[in-house]
């Protein structure tokens, strides 16, 4: 149901932003007018870029951007961990507005690329990304937040300051700006 909802619809006229490039990036690019996909990990970025280059399909409508973290070297995760609470010991890099400084270039990369009709949040510094959506969209922009329910609402609760809930399918939450 989730794949059908996101990947198998044709959003041919839409301009889409994806924070967190992945194996679905080519599938999305095939179904939209234009895709901006931002990745923080250099090795993963090269893999996605190579996979798209060797494909027989044209991805001229896709702009892949590499934006490594400010701290953490060559695009690997900045290893900060939750110190207490239900997520004690788990990596903290995917959440939290406080990670904006670690991923500033990644979060801010699309600011001159919008407006976008659809925004997909599936990478690092997710709350920081959510906080920028109002600058990147319009009144009808839909925001899809992958794995929103996996860690529990408290993990990403700051997102409700920036986005209005609009439904969900499994672990994919849908919001409006």
List where the protein language model places each region.
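C-terminal substrate-binding/active-site "lid" region of AdoMet-derived donor-dependent transferases
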Residues: 106-177
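Exposed alpha-helical structural elements
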Residues: 4, 47, 102, 155-158
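A short linear-motif detector with a strong N-terminal bias
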Residues: 14-16, 98-99, 122, 153-154
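Short, surface-exposed linear patches
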Residues: 38-41, 58-60, 87, 140-145, ...
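Internal catalytic-core helix/loop-beta-alpha segment
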Residues: 64-132
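SAM cofactor-binding core of SAM-dependent methyltransferases
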Residues: 2-80
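N-terminal start-of-chain detector that recognizes signal peptides
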Residues: 6-11, 36, 91-93, 116-117, ...
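A generic short-segment signal for beta-strand/edge and adjacent turn/coil regions
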Residues: 3-7, 86-90, 112-113, 141-145
């Amino acid at each position: 149901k989730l794949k059908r909802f996101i990947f198998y619809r044709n959003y041919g006229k839409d301009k889409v932003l994806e924070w967190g490039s992945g194996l679905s990036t080519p599938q999305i690019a095939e179904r939209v007018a234009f895709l901006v996909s931002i990745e923080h990990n250099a090795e993963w970025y090269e893999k996605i870029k190579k996979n798209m280059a060797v494909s027989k399909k044209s991805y001229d409508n896709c702009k892949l951007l590499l934006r490594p973290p400010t701290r953490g070297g060559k695009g690997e995760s900045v290893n900060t961990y939750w110190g207490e609470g239900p997520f004690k010991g788990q990596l903290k890099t995917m959440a939290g507005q406080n990670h904006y400084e670690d991923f500033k270039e990644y979060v801010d990369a699309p600011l001159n690329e919008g407006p976008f009709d659809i925004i997909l949040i599936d990478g690092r510094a997710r709350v920081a990304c959510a906080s920028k959506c109002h600058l990147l969209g319009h009144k009808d922009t839909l925001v899809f937040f992958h794995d929103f329910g996996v860690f529990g609402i408290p993990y990403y609760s700051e997102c409700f300051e920036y986005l209005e809930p609009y439904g969900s399918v499994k672990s994919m939450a849908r919001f409006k700006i």
